């Protein structure tokens, strides 16, 4: 007979979570840290100015049933490049609870950007709309935001007012204290990223 602890570990999780990845924010913070001398693990998947990913980025969600992980980003280039990036993201996996039966591949939300600029608002707006939509439709019990952008603080306030648990993960570089203050749990991605 299994101990209560073992039963809890192997039981399918009941709390539903969705993960929202501000890929634009993550990739620029990652690149900044690399430029400052940090050495990434060999397993990191990186396309300059487009995405950075490691399946351990969803570490905080492993005790939840992760329904979906949506990766929001921009691409400069033609439609073929946009499709290629979408396919690359769709082929990547996230870590999940060992008893989960759901698929664990990323759901890409890729915006085409015609000019090379540092950032845009399409990612932030779409991520916010999607998060609020899922929260108010009752699709989730918890959310995990991967971003260090303090602009999401009011969004997290609304999510918490709806009774949803809020988890936030980001690189230490520029990790907004206003996000950390609003999160029920915080995880810095540095430990899973650098050698």
State the predicted function of each range.
Residues 2-123, 165:
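Domain-level signal for Mg2+-assisted phosphodiester chemistry and nucleotide/NA-binding surfaces
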Residues 94-195:
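Nuclease catalytic cores that cleave nucleic-acid phosphodiester bonds
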């Amino acid at each position: 007979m299994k101990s209560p602890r073992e039963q809890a570990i192997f039981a399918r999780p009941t709390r539903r979570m969705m993960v929202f990845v501000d890929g634009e924010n993550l990739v620029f913070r990652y690149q900044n840290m690399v430029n400052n001398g940090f050495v990434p693990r060999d397993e990191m998947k990186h396309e300059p100015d487009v995405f950075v990913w490691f399946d351990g980025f969803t570490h905080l969600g492993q005790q939840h049933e992760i329904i979906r992980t949506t990766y929001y980003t921009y691409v400069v280039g033609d439609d073929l490049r946009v499709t290629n990036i979408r396919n690359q993201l769709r082929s990547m996996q996230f870590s999940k609870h060992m008893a989960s039966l759901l698929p664990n591949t990323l759901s890409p939300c890729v915006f085409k950007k015609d000019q090379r600029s540092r950032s845009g608002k399409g990612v932030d707006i779409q991520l916010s709309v999607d998060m609020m939509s899922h929260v108010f439709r009752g699709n989730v019990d918890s959310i995990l935001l991967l971003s260090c952008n303090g602009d999401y603080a009011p969004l997290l306030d609304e999510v918490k007012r709806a009774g949803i648990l809020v988890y936030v993960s980001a690189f230490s570089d520029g990790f907004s204290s206003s996000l950390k203050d609003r999160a029920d749990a915080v995880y810095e991605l540095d430990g899973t990223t650098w050698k």
